[in-house]
Every structure is written in C-alpha cells, then in structure tokens.
From Swiss-Prot:
UniProt protein name: Nitrogen fixation protein NifU 1
Ranges of biased composition (kind: Basic and acidic residues): 1-10
Keyword Signal appears in the UniProt entry: no
Signal peptide (UniProt feature, chain positions): none
Keywords, sorted A to Z: Nitrogen fixation
Stretches for region Disordered: 1-29
Upper lineage: Bacteria, Pseudomonadati, Pseudomonadota, Alphaproteobacteria, Rhodobacterales
GO molecular function: iron ion binding; iron-sulfur cluster binding
One GO term of the biological process aspect: nitrogen fixation
Function: May be involved in the formation or repair of [Fe-S] clusters present in iron-sulfur proteins.
Pfam families: NifU (PF01106)
Magnesium keyword on record: no
Family: Belongs to the NifU family.
Low complexity: compositionally biased ranges: 18-29
Amino acid sequence: MRDMQDDDTKSPAPPPAAAAAARRAAGQAAPDASALRDRFAKLAQADTPEAATDAAAAADDEVTRIRALIDEMRPTFRRDGGDIELVRVEGAKVIVHLSGACAGCMLAGQTLYGVQKRITDVLGRPFRVIPDIRH
C-alpha cells in the first residue's frame, strides 16, 4: 500500500496524535467535529427527493420574480420604441431579448446593466443579464 505523502516535501503525513499535539503546541483549536457532522448531515439531506423538489420550487419562484421585474420595466422600454423579453434563466444567468429601438441602441449595454442591478438588488444575489441574439 502506498504511503500517504505530502507532495511538496515527499515526507509521510504525521499520525493524527502528532497532528493534534502540533496544533496544541501552536495554540490552535482542534477541528469542531460536531460542525463537520452537521455539514455532512445537511449534504445527505440535499440528496433527498424532498430537497430536490424544494430547490426546483425555489428556482421557479426566482424565475417568476425575475419575469415580474422585467414586466415592471417594460413600459420604459416601450416608451422609447423598444422592448425587453425574458427568454430563460440558467442558474445565475438571465437571458433576455431586446427588440425594436433597444436592439440597435448604443446604450443597450448600460440598459442591461441597469436590469441586472435591479434583479440583483431585489433577489439579493448576483445575476448576469445576457442579451439573446436572434437573427
């Protein structure tokens, strides 16, 4: 069986008792085993069908909220002779289609940044708004 070695020094890894003694000598606390157990328990729960259903429901709720935010902004786009439409959401990417005057506008990048900022502010996590190019 191959010895466990540190790639940098090529020396065997210290036994757990020696590692614990070195931590105590350096004034470091031992790792919190209960926190690790809790983390693994949460990871195990994430694999359940209920967790998958909850995650899908949360994603659907985010898409609904993003769609509502874009619908709130549409009158501004239409007033300027353009329009914005939600194409799809892929994780933290929001793909939108700009049409009319907005499609060829030199300020489209700034407009998309404004939409991105609004979505990020309201939903409380970062999103990236990307234009969908249709021909």
